[in-house]
Amino acid sequence: MITRVLITGANAGLGKETAKQLASNSEIGKIYLGCRNMEKALAAKLELEQLTGRSIFEVLIIDVSNQVSVVEAVQRLDCSVDALIMNAGGTGGKNFNKINSNGVTEIFAVNLLGHSLLAQELLKAGKLLKVAIYAGSEAARGVKEMGMKRPELPTSSEEEFAMVLFSKKHKMPLSHTVL
């Protein structure tokens, strides 16, 4: 049974809607809203509590594009989670090729590397018990700001394809369900 869930990118869009939908399940006892901005996270928490009538939401500040932030967030997590929904990410907007301090593009850092590190750190700490789901979607829709059309590929971006491969690699030896 899944009772505790961590959702990255949970202050808006699909992440917030996922939190709302999960809260409708009475078996869910805690939903960590993984967000990089405290003000937006607290606003989302308040809105979700009002919409659902449940006080099961807890803010976990995490910027998945920043390796230090990811490691520190896992250390601050006060208990294990049954499910990790890796939703944070995006397209990078007009600066999608900007190189970060780790020598990779911001879009690659947030859409793949950060989530990979998050899953690894949670597993290493014994804080991810059952399932990890990669839920990135921006590239699947295409982004007009970048002049992108909707892709016609089976996977919607290189980052998503890489995450699928990462997930498959870790599925068997860890005996966790990874979708």
Task: Report residues per predicted region.
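Rossmann-fold NAD(P)H-dependent dehydrogenase/reductase core
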Residues: 2-179
